[in-house]
Amino acid sequence: MDYSKTLNLPTTEFPMRANLPQREPEIGRFWDEIEVYQLVQAKNAGRPKFILHDGPPYANGHIHLGTSLNKILKDIVVKFKSMDGYNAPYVPGWDTHGLPIEQQAIKQLKIKRSALSPVEFRRMCREYALKFVDIQRAEFKRLGVRGEWHNPYLTLQPHFETRQIEVFGEMAKRGYIYKGLKSVYWCADCETALAEAEVEYAEKESPSIHVAFPVVNGRGLLPDQDAAIVIWTTTPWTIPSNVAICVHPEYAYVLLRSGGRAYLVARDLAGNFRELLGDPGAGVEREYRGEELEGVVCRHPFVERDSVVVLADYVTLEQGTGCVHIAPGHGEEDFALGQRYNLPVISPINGKGYFTAEAGNLDGIFYLDANPVVVRELEARGALVGYSRMRHQYPHCWRCKHPVFYRATEQWFASIDGFRRHLLEAIDRVQWIPGWGRDRIRGMVAGRGDWCISRQRVWGVPIPIFYCGDCGRAVITDETISHLKGLFAEHGSDVWYAWEAAELVPPGLVCPHCRGRGDFTKELDTMDVWFDSGSSHWAVLTQPDYWPDLQWPADMYLEGSDQHRGWFNSSLTTAVAVTGEPPYRAVLTHGFVVDEQGRKMSKSLGNVIEPMEVLKELGADILRLWVCSADYRGDLAVSPGILKQMSEAYRKIRNTFRFLLGNLQDFDPDRDTVAYTELTELDRYALLKLHRVTDRVLRAYREYEFHQVYHTLYNYCVTDLSAFYLNVIKDRLYCEPARSVNRRGAQTVLYAVLDSLVRLLVPVLAYTTEEVWGHFPANGKKPPSVQLLEMPEPNPEYLDDELERRWERLLAVRQDVLRALEAARQEKLIRDALEAEAVLYAEPELLEFLRENTVQLPVIFVTSSVRVLPAAEAGGEEAVSGTVAGLKVAVRRAPGTKCVRCWTYGETGVDPEHPEICPRCATVLSGLNL
């Protein structure tokens, strides 16, 4: 007889092979068909809101691993919150203006910018941006991210732009917007001013020069004939714009005599300077305190201009000479110092980075190419004291990656000083995750200068300012902003370029400054794109006509740590300026994606991993599992090897689901559930472990400790389930009568485990949990999608401290037995545990404990028999000590013969009709009416 046909073997259509790259798109289409986002929102209507406001990615190019990481983290948060008692809408957004889109539109559409009108060029930029919105939307959806994809926010939408100029107008009304000449970051390649947030530092090689400025009026302190003050700089091209030399008022300075000339440098740097001169014996003629030197006049090395000594506390002694060359036209600190001393601002470089005629013989030379020209001129004049090359961190444009420089131009600014104190106070009212984010953004806000918000570009939101034709002053009032909001809402911001100023101003506009009604002109600069995205809290969260589920402020912003200086900062600035409050209650930041060696992803290093390629090869759930597994507070390492490890971890989780489903194929929870009080001790312990795991995972989700979610659930599947509970109940599941309380009790636990496990993993394994839900035992109340479920609640009924202590002790004994069984396998004494009899020799207290639990031991050891004997009877037998004190374990061949149905060894042949099976199996068969 084929006894295998009498067993309750697991059966399920849930496939062993995941085949995620093929199966996931099918599930994605299913979500679209049932409109799962709308179903979730309907289910959660009326609940407390949790608003995660999406930081808009740039609509330029395909998504990369960094944007994938960010979107998956957001999806984990939103999905969990929507299953944890909240109404958690998610409206994705895109940043759609700015120079990179201009450049790519020109490149890909093969158009000539100068041949197009601003309106035509803006139309092409819009088409390009919208194309990549569609591309990225499909890619984000493929990651399994749920959201209001049919109704995202775009910074180019008229209803967004109207709110943006409303924010601008309100800031202007409060006196925070002004136009002024300042030294700002400038990108020659992009031909525009940059904000601090648009600058990143990268290593660059530069010339390092020491330059002597001859003293012409030493004010009785320094010789007027043969003395010079020595400055050090890595930007020789700024020397033509020098107007002053700065020293620290409290530092000591010395006059060194060498080769018939006297040089002034900081005392603490004199040793280095002697080495530079090659004159270690250069003597000190006199020492000065920095503040004494104020007003000393030097002559510019090759320009007919004086250079006066000024004082500032920011001078350091880290390198150089302690004497700093000052060019207010080419440095933020220089400019501020120049304002204090009323110094001239010289900035003879145009927007493309070329010197103008004002620079004399440098006219027409690109500023970086001017370095060797300046060095040669200094050398010819005898002013070059030292020259070398050095590598150092230098500011670069984060869009085009070219070096940037400071250039004094007239720009529009937001005055941070006007409300800096309010910004710092607002920061303290926000929860920062991790906590160090608070100090980081406080430092940035405390030290930042005014925000340069104007850009010399066309593709952007125009700065909504007119100029009076009579007095020339800027005009921005409630009336002009209100009128423009109506025009922008109806026509979009293109109207600014399509219409003349006379058509844009409100009818009968009167200049508030001179009461003139003359011809008005319009500002041609656009707003910094950080003002676009920085206004999104107001443009998106306060527009119920477009996004009725949202509200202000957001509960959370979640972005990479670089956004402390970017979106977090710009959003905070506009919100506090307009409302006095931060736009977010909490800010969560994550690190960057790096390779196994901690290096950034780079094509030159060949370590770039494209997310869409991962999806094609492994599936989105593998990427999502990787995101969850890593501690996002630091940089996140990824490589093909790491993704392979995640695939293996996923396989183990999937196999756990498959085992659970396979053994619940005949289980109806409404009909077959066994009451807790009727369950075996083993089953009650399994439910206790489930309670602990559920509680731990829910706390980890709520505290945004997602890596703890992963590690807890993975270890639960592998250790608590696969290696223990699921293994030891196989005999009950397969061999006991199908409807017996013993088997139904085990199934009751399996159902509870499956029900909790699938819910707990929905935010992480979006596709797989949906697939599991499709095979879930039906009980007539099953919603169409797993995403419509709630998180499981830990069941306090399962808590039993005494049971837990007892079973933790039993499992410790089990570990010693498993080690002894493995040793017996290695020695070829047995092939598997059912061929064994475990003999436990125990000291009195442990002996009593084990005898009290004798019935459990063969089950949890998965051996055919177990004997428990006093330690004194161990004798000379090969009994091995383990980790449990007072215990030795010996393994023998189990007595009896093998039951061909359940494979345990013992008595067989009791039933003459079934001579090869054990009495238990014979009893089961008798009830089957074979």
UniProtKB/Swiss-Prot annotation:
A motif ('KMSKS' region) lies at residues 600-604. One of its GO terms (cellular component) is cytosol. L-isoleucyl-5'-AMP binds at E559. GO terms for molecular function: aminoacyl-tRNA deacylase activity; ATP binding; isoleucine-tRNA ligase activity; tRNA binding; zinc ion binding. A motif ('HIGH' region) lies at residues 57-67. Zn(2+) binds at C899, C902, C918, C921. GO terms for biological process: isoleucyl-tRNA aminoacylation. It is an enzyme of class 6 (ligase). It catalyses: tRNA(Ile) + L-isoleucine + ATP = L-isoleucyl-tRNA(Ile) + AMP + diphosphate. Binds 1 zinc ion per subunit. Pfam families: Anticodon_1, tRNA-synt_1, zf-FPG_IleRS. Its EC number is 6.1.1.5. Its cofactor is Zn(2+). Its main location: cytoplasm. Keywords: Aminoacyl-tRNA synthetase, ATP-binding, Cytoplasm, Ligase, Metal-binding, Nucleotide-binding, Protein biosynthesis, Zinc. ATP binds at K603. It is found in: Cytoplasm. Belongs to the class-I aminoacyl-tRNA synthetase family. IleS type 1 subfamily. HAMAP family: Ile_tRNA_synth_type1. Monomer. IleRS has two distinct active sites: one for aminoacylation and one for editing. The misactivated valine is translocated from the active site to the editing site, which sterically excludes the correctly activated isoleucine. The single editing site contains two valyl binding pockets, one specific for each substrate (Val-AMP or Val-tRNA(Ile)). Catalyzes the attachment of isoleucine to tRNA(Ile). As IleRS can inadvertently accommodate and process structurally similar amino acids such as valine, to avoid such errors it has two additional distinct tRNA(Ile)-dependent editing activities. One activity is designated as 'pretransfer' editing and involves the hydrolysis of activated Val-AMP. The other activity is designated 'posttransfer' editing and involves deacylation of mischarged Val-tRNA(Ile). This is Isoleucine--tRNA ligase. It comes from Desulforudis audaxviator (strain MP104C). The gene is ileS.
